[in-house]
Amino acid sequence: MDQQDLNKLQTNLSDAEIRLASIIESFIELGVSVYDFPGTQESTQGMVTNLKRNVERIKLLNQHANDPDSQLRNMNIPLEVLQYIEDGRNPDVYTREFVEAIRRSNQYQRAKMHALKKLRDSLAEKIGEEFPDLVPQVQGIIERANGSRDK
């Protein structure tokens, strides 16, 4: 993605965020209205108007997200994040847990690589001690494996 695409994506995301915040706020207002519903014709008409406005806002947000020129079409959101949101959890928790899992995996892989290098060097040393005539071949293998014998 070049800088122009990133700027367009940022603009599209900001616009979608504003629209979504407006929809959420309207639904909160609608929930309060339903809770305090007095049952009059005027209040019924107000709720219907608010509901129609929300449906129209959702329709516009959907059109904006599916616009061929919109960068939002290229956004992929992991299903796990959506599940977190549906469960009422903060999606930042998913991000933090994901990063921690990757960090643990990287540490594990790094430890395995270190252990294998130590095993390689130990084997090379023992082979060199037992079979001195194989030292050049062992050194060649270590060099081809892009390793070094650190003591």
Swiss-Prot record:
<dbReference type="GO" id="GO:0000122">
    <property type="term" value="P:negative regulation of transcription by RNA polymerase II"/>
</dbReference>
<protein>
    <recommendedName>
        <fullName>Mediator of RNA polymerase II transcription subunit 10</fullName>
    </recommendedName>
</protein>
<keyword id="KW-0010">Activator</keyword>
<dbReference type="GO" id="GO:0070847">
    <property type="term" value="C:core mediator complex"/>
</dbReference>
<keyword id="KW-0804">Transcription</keyword>
<dbReference type="GO" id="GO:0032968">
    <property type="term" value="P:positive regulation of transcription elongation by RNA polymerase II"/>
</dbReference>
<comment type="function">
    <text>Component of the Mediator complex, a coactivator involved in the regulated transcription of nearly all RNA polymerase II-dependent genes. Mediator functions as a bridge to convey information from gene-specific regulatory proteins to the basal RNA polymerase II transcription machinery. Mediator is recruited to promoters by direct interactions with regulatory proteins and serves as a scaffold for the assembly of a functional preinitiation complex with RNA polymerase II and the general transcription factors.</text>
</comment>
<dbReference type="Pfam" id="PF09748">
    <property type="entry name" value="Med10"/>
</dbReference>
<keyword id="KW-0539">Nucleus</keyword>
<dbReference type="InterPro" id="IPR019145">
    <property type="entry name" value="Mediator_Med10"/>
</dbReference>
<dbReference type="GO" id="GO:0016592">
    <property type="term" value="C:mediator complex"/>
</dbReference>
<comment type="subunit">
    <text>Component of the Mediator complex.</text>
</comment>
<dbReference type="GO" id="GO:0003712">
    <property type="term" value="F:transcription coregulator activity"/>
</dbReference>
<dbReference type="GO" id="GO:0060261">
    <property type="term" value="P:positive regulation of transcription initiation by RNA polymerase II"/>
</dbReference>
<comment type="similarity">
    <text>Belongs to the Mediator complex subunit 10 family.</text>
</comment>
<keyword id="KW-0805">Transcription regulation</keyword>
<dbReference type="GO" id="GO:0051123">
    <property type="term" value="P:RNA polymerase II preinitiation complex assembly"/>
</dbReference>
